[in-house]
């Protein structure tokens, strides 16, 4: 393959991965999944009923791995056995995967809310009806973009793994990145905006999540809107960089061209990792110097 064509394919893969990362994080925000959902689950038990979609089907890595694997398996069957257009096969597989994901989401939130009836937590059917299509939409975008990445890597770049295996791996990866990157914006900031920023969360405030929005009661749409400003784009950039840089190394230094090129790809990968570690350390040090530790108010110090 010509180097320019390979770089063009990598650019397309990077764009698709960035979109997939952003939509994955926003899907977990609107449906409340992964780590922050522990506070949503705890809220009714602390006498704080809410209108937050409480699905948390599983951790994001296995949830997205299942979703992407289903879409890839269906697309593979349609392409290989029925000679269907790859684009149609990827779209159809993504629709089925999003439908399965929505089914799990509805049963999960209804089961969780029903189990908390003793704590006066209602089941808001209007909330479920309004949130489920949005969850399906985000799930479709995530699955479709991951399938595009996997298909291009398999067919164009000649990756040895089959489409379903690649989709499974990227599903785990995108779920892990969304859980560790974007969910921090939702769980550490959006859920507890009534407490002063930087003060941390006292154990006595566990479950005391924000339940009232700018107008009316807060729901998943409010959380998704807020996290689309930072958490979603950050997750998209993180996943896009992971996919692009991981494939860029072996495209520039193709191990198939010889042992020396293989070692050059390893060295390039190590250098990139070291640069990212140092960059992250610099950002953390700068943030600590700029904002410092949390300081108590003078009134609090006087009363103490």
Swiss-Prot record:
The chain crosses the membrane at residues 3-23, 77-97, 133-153, 155-175, 233-253, 259-279. Pathway: One-carbon metabolism; methanogenesis from CO(2); methyl-coenzyme M from 5,10-methylene-5,6,7,8-tetrahydromethanopterin: step 2/2. It is an enzyme of class 7 (translocase). It catalyses: 5-methyl-5,6,7,8-tetrahydromethanopterin + coenzyme M + 2 Na(+)(in) = 5,6,7,8-tetrahydromethanopterin + methyl-coenzyme M + 2 Na(+)(out). It is a multi-pass membrane protein. One of its GO terms (cellular component) is cytoplasm. It is found in: Cell membrane. This is Tetrahydromethanopterin S-methyltransferase subunit E. It comes from Methanosarcina mazei (strain ATCC BAA-159 / DSM 3647 / Goe1 / Go1 / JCM 11833 / OCM 88) (Methanosarcina frisia).
């Amino acid at each position: 393959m010509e180097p320019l064509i390979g770089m063009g394919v990598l650019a397309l893969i990077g764009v698709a991965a960035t979109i997939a990362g952003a939509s994955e994080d926003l899907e977990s925000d609107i449906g409340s999944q992964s780590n922050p959902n522990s506070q949503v689950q705890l809220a009714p038990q602390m006498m704080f009923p809410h209108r937050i979609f409480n699905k948390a089907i599983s951790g994001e890595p296995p949830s997205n791995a299942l979703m992407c694997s289903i879409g890839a398996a269906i697309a593979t069957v349609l392409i290989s056995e029925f000679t269907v257009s790859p684009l149609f096969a990827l779209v159809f597989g993504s629709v089925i995967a999003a439908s399965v994901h929505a089914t799990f989401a509805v049963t999960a939130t209804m089961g969780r809310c029903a189990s908390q009836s003793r704590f006066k937590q209602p089941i808001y059917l209007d909330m479920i009806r309004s949130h489920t299509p949005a969850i399906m939409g985000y799930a479709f975008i995530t699955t479709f973009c991951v399938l595009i990445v996997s298909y291009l890597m398999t067919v164009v770049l000649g990756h040895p793994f089959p489409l379903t295996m690649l989709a499974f791996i990227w599903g785990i990866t995108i779920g892990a990145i969304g859980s560790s990157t974007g969910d921090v914006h939702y769980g550490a900031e959006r859920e507890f905006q009534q407490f002063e920023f930087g003060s941390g969360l006292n154990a006595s405030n566990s479950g005391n999540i924000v339940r009232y929005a700018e107008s009316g009661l807060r729901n998943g749409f409010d959380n998704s809107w807020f996290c689309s400003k930072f958490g979603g784009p950050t997750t998209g950039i993180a996943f896009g960089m992971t996919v692009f840089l991981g494939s860029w190394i072996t495209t520039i230094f193709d191990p198939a061209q010889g042992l020396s090129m293989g070692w050059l790809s390893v060295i390039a990968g190590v250098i990139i990792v070291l640069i990212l570690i140092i960059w992250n350390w610099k950002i953390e040090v700068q943030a600590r110097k700029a904002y410092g530790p949390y300081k108590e108010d003078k009134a609090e110090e006087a009363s103490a």
